[in-house]
Every structure is written in structure tokens, then in C-alpha cells.
Amino acid sequence: MFLIVGLGNPGEKYLNNRHNVGFQCVAEFARRHHLSFDGKRSDARIAEGLVNGQRVALARPQTFMNDSGKSVVGLVNWYKIDPASELLVVYDDLDLPFGTIKLRNQGSSGGQRGMNSIIQLLGTQKFARLRFGIGRPPEGWEVINFVLGNWNAAERETLPKLYDRAVEACELCLSDGVTKAMNAVNGEAPKKSKDQAKEPANEQPR
């Protein structure tokens, strides 16, 4: 079993937030492979199935972002998997420009609170993660308002291609292993278009 966890917050109000890009990526993976999130386990919505002959579980923790580790540890124990080789976590990363997707086989949380929780409760940093760049907030914005804000129009136009790249990265992890997948995924970050540079980040949530 290979477990792919997308991080986010449950509930309609958070559905299209930047912070929920992990949820959005695993939802696209499920759609592409005709899997349904009709299971529930360890405070997570679960979709299971075969992808290219390999058993896969997709998870969207329902614990809220900052407590993601509680759900992930429960799932790791339930499926009896080795995090170092059978776990991939997908999440938003402020330190990567929007449009950048990076795959790593281990490392720190980079300050992302969901990852903080997972690392703390798993007791290890040795598991794969797919970092989906959302960029830094515009001047004058609080970080919390930016990550809990919805994508702006220019970002929404680009997202389908980025979701495709994220799903393809997950598929490469399954077919080739994380180390080989890293070589294919970690190319140069795409340049920001003029439209994206000018587009406002949307009004801050109140």
C-alpha cells in the first residue's frame, strides 16, 4: 500500500483556499483514476484502489491543518506502512513561488504547521513530500489571511496545468520510486506571467 495524503481544512468555506491545495491535488488524482472518497478512517476521508497495479490510498485529514499528524499517524499504523518508502504528503508551500512544484524524500516542515504536526507525531522527517508553491502574500497582508484566501483569477487559470503536474509527480512516485521521480519533477520553476504579476491576490478574508 502506498499512502498519499493531501493536507487542508475540512468544510465548504475552506474548499478553494490556497491552504487546501493538498486536498485539491489528491481530489484531482482520484478523479483521474476513478477513485471515490467514500471511506473514513483515522479522522480522514479515504479513497482506495489500484493504480497501475499498485494498491493506493488517498487521504484528506478532517482534523484541520494544524492537527494533521493525528490522522496521518493513525493511517500509517492502520495500513502498516513504512513512512520512508510508502508515504507521500502533498501541501502548500509559501517559500516556493506560485507555479513551482518540488518533490523531496525528507526534510523539515519549513514552518508549515500541518507538516510540523506530522513530523512531531511520526517522530521522523524521513518521508516524501510534494511541495506546491503558493508564493508569499502581497505587501500588507497577514500570512494567515493569504493562505486562507481563495485563488485569484490569474491563479485559477493556471491551476489545471499545475494540478496535472502534481498528479503526474504522484504517479511517478508510484511507478518509479521517489528518488527517480525527484529527478523528473524538480526542474526549473516556471516564470511568472505579466498577468499573474499584476493580478491582485483577492480581498483579505474578514
From Swiss-Prot:
Site feature location: Stabilizes the basic form of H active site to accept a proton: D92
GO cellular component annotations of the record: cytoplasm
Region (Disordered): 185-206
Active site: H19 (proton acceptor)
Start-end of Basic and acidic residues biased regions: 189-206
Subcellular location: Cytoplasm
InterPro entries: Pept_tRNA_hydro (IPR001328), Pept_tRNA_hydro_sf (IPR036416)
A molecular function GO annotation: tRNA binding
Gene Ontology BP annotations: protein quality control for misfolded or incompletely synthesized proteins; rescue of stalled ribosome
Keyword tRNA-binding: yes
Chain residues that bind tRNA: Y14, F64, N66
First-tier enzyme category under EC: hydrolase
Reactions mediated catalytically: an N-acyl-L-alpha-aminoacyl-tRNA + H2O = an N-acyl-L-amino acid + a tRNA + H(+)
Enzyme Commission numbers on file: 3.1.1.29
Main localisation: cytoplasm
Site feature Discriminates between blocked and unblocked aminoacyl-tRNA, where: N9
Keywords: Cytoplasm, Hydrolase, RNA-binding, tRNA-binding
SUPFAM superfamilies, per the entry: Peptidyl-tRNA hydrolase-like
Disulfide bonds: none
Functional summary from the UniProt entry: Hydrolyzes ribosome-free peptidyl-tRNAs (with 1 or more amino acids incorporated), which drop off the ribosome during protein synthesis, or as a result of ribosome stalling. Catalyzes the release of premature peptidyl moieties from peptidyl-tRNA molecules trapped in stalled 50S ribosomal subunits, and thus maintains levels of free tRNAs and 50S ribosomes.
Assembly behavior: Monomer.
Family note: Belongs to the PTH family.
NCBIfam families the record matches: pth (TIGR00447)
Name of this protein: Peptidyl-tRNA hydrolase
